[in-house]
Amino acid sequence: MHPFERVLSVSTEDIELELRGVKEISWADFWLNPRKLRGSDFLMRWSQGVWAEKRLIDATNKTNQFYAIPYGPSGTAPTNDVRAFELYFERLEADGLGNIKRPDLLVFKIAEKPFVDKFLVSIGGEEELPFITEDKLQELISKAIIAVECENSLWVAAKMPAYNLPMKPQKRLGGKLGLPKVAVLPTVIIKEEDRIPLSRWQQENKIPIHVWHVFFDKAYGLSFDEAQRLVTEGLILPTEQVFQAPDGATTKKAIYKYYYHYAYPLGIATERPQLIPAFIEDKNGHILPYVKFEGDSLDILPEAIKILKQF
């Protein structure tokens, strides 16, 4: 799959759930076709991903104790122009780097900020990071305390139906604690296809990976090692979902949904994002509406800061 399509692939189950959770958003009426038509759903996915990563970077940097930068291509790519975003991934593909999996963010102690900024200037800016092989980035990577894989969901976590429900023994888990398969609650998500490359990246670079999942009102974190343990011990089972790529193709993929009970509280929203109507006009004059997220604020919680200080 082309890297542009992989980044903007949408779980059809997530689309259905997100629509049920945010019925008041009128732009959800626009479900057009993919990459060739610049479908509004995929423009929305692009805007959503930009928002989530920026939100986490801003929240981390606002602590004045840690410094986060985008590292994976979804975060270093242009964020204000979807066509430039696509061309960025075309360039990655042309350079033979399109299928390389990297975490989305690197997080450093604030004392490393001068070094990090100087390093980024020396390579031509953070947007050049995905075009440089990691053997030439070790000086930067080695300074990081963690790497972050970003996920996001269009849900108000505290209003999800199974939020605050305790885990109980489940037959499908062999009597181990869990929740019904159909329970709708905040989860931290990892795709099966990402587990091996993320594990390899963590092992090769000796930097722990955490998954940070952003909701409208909260954010949760889970270490990759803990996620692996939960799967190994049979506490979390894979779920198969159908994903639609921007070219219209659908594929079945296994994902792991980790109950928020297993995660640590990462952040809380102090300001909700505004949903700003936007559109693009294609070369044929076709108008495609979508929504941009603007003007929100997330604070990193003391529990998460305590975890980061351990590194």
Question: Would you name each region that the model predicts?
Answer:
Residues M1-D29, E134-K136, A162, P166-L185, ...:
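Non-catalytic C-terminal interaction segments of nucleic acid-processing enzymes
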Residues M1-K101:
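Interdomain/boundary linker segments immediately adjacent to catalytic/signaling cores
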Residues L37-R38, R83-F89, G124-I132, L179-A183, ...:
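Short linear interaction motifs
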Residues Q48-A52, I189-D194:
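Soluble or luminal CAZymes and related metallo-dependent hydrolases
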Residues T60, P103-L129, T133-V184:
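Conserved catalytic cores of phosphodiester-cleaving nucleases, focusing on short active-site segments
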Residues A68-Y71, A147-E149, I209-V214:
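A structural signal for short, well-ordered beta-strand segments and their strand-loop junctions
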Residues G75-A77, S153-W155, F216-A219:
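Short, solvent-exposed loop/turn segments at secondary-structure junctions
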Residues G96-N99, L137-I141, Q202:
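Short, charge-rich binding segments
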